[in-house]
Amino acid sequence: MGGNQALTSGQERGDVRRGHLERGDPHSEWLARLHQVFGGAIDIEWAIARAGAAPGQTDALGVPPGTRVVLQVRPALFPVRRNETLSLANHKEILGDPPSRWMVGMASAVAFDVMLYFATIEPVVATWKEPYAVELAERAWLNVSAFYRLMDHWGLPRTMITEGLGGETGANPRDARFIAKRFIRFLPRLLRMQWASLWRVSGIARQLKDFDRRLEAAAGLPDLWRASVEILAESIPSALALGGMLSTANRVRRVLRVRSGGTIVTHDMMAEYAALAELPDAQSRLAGLDAWLEKYGHRGPLETDPSQPRFAELRPALESALRRRASPDNALASARHSRLRAALLRPLFLPDEWRERFKDDLLRRWQRLRAKILAQAKIAVTEGWLEAPEDVFLLAGDDLSAAPATWRSRVSDRRSRLEAARSLDLPCTASREEIEAIMRQAQASPATEPDRQELSPRLLRGIGLGRRVVTGTAVRATTLLSLLARDDLPEQPILVVPTLDPGWSVVFPRFAAIVVELGGELSHASILIRETGQTAVVNARGACQAVAEGALLQVDPVRGEVRLL
């Protein structure tokens, strides 16, 4: 560049500008082919021949205009740092924002082990050295770049990732398409992937028994930390296997225009709680609550994070809600099919049933894990190592392996970091460098409220669930407990929330429709909503900013639209 020998020889680094290469980008495909020739970590100096010449004309070297010319290729002299596309969509939905330090530490600890599941099917994945999750701003961000890379490699649509996990791929129409040549080439590998997924699913019962043994053997807090990491490292690949099967089944269902037909455990949980609320007297409702908690007490809001309380611990809130209420506001029912049609459709919904059952079984172990962690934390409080048992969830592996006398100071430091991270105005999906820039800006300037003065849109688009158009009044909420304590709902209430997980199902019957800012078509909550036949629009970006409490809304799931009237 301008005869700068140090720069062109690779001894110095110039102005580095990173960009996001979209699917179908010609430079990306050309560089990928070049890398196949040389391999390894390399610096490539290249240029594009002078443009603007007449057709057929060449430059002094005989190169046609627009041709890419390789000037030199050399081993990289600087560390190659990935600028991954990261997303909070799925983790924000199931873990909250921000999650506990314990949960973030677990996700970071298993980040590379999880991707080995794909490497057993596609060996090239091991050479990518891509983590499943990246820790930034006290959160575990899903590394969607790794999954997009895998989809591109196999010729599959990138939208298969966002369907199951939420988030967004952008406006590139190529993201929703197959890459025909690659798909045909790797079709045997994809069939092998489905077989491997079935094999892993068939071993889930053995896996759960192994989890039981590990939990039983774990004693102190460091042991419980290791057990939780080991269980998570095994359970995420199983969940991914089920998710892959579910995504395939969902595409078949779209072709057949079949919307519902499964029997999932969270639907039973919701229906049985709704039946309690319909009982005529409070005493009967409270008596039935014991039986309900026996079956579903291991569930709860943000239940994937062990730091979050289960329904068994939230009995006072559930009891108070049942004392005040005699019946739900909006009766829900699953879609009805003839026996023959239901039997024919059920195989298409088995992945839904298996995934929800696996999560339910896993959460029973998570409840036991939480109880054992808190029991050991109480001992730590007695010893003076912690101020309160719940403080243990502000610690992770490195903290727990340190001297217990340091735990209090570590908790204090982590709490300060969490409070600072909580105030960050973070995008749902962004590049690593964009997120780091937001963090640096927050450190350099005092915390301020994000600017929300721009005009709110009157029309929001997302993923529609259900068929019935509903007009009603917006009811905003950020926590399940705030809804359980609330009686003053309008006649046609429409729940508007930033995220949703199956724990919220106990209040679903109280609402005529649901609007969720984040979420995918195949998320746990979306599957439940679909099976109830309830009207909803998920992944309605900007809903919590645009929709005020009491606003008049129309939710149209067929169009996937939310209109402010």
Predicted regions and their residues:
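Extended active-site and interfacial segments that coordinate phosphate-rich ligands
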Residues: 1-26, 63-115, 513-515, 531-532
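Acidic, glycine-rich flexible loop/linker segments
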Residues: 7, 23-42, 49-80, 474-493, ...
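Short glycine/serine/threonine-biased micro-segments
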Residues: 8, 382, 464, 517-518
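Short hydrophobic alpha-helical segments that form membrane-spanning helices or hydrophobic packing faces
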Residues: 17, 72-74, 390-396, 526
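Contiguous hydrophobic, helix-prone segments at protein termini
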Residues: 32, 36, 42, 50-65, ...
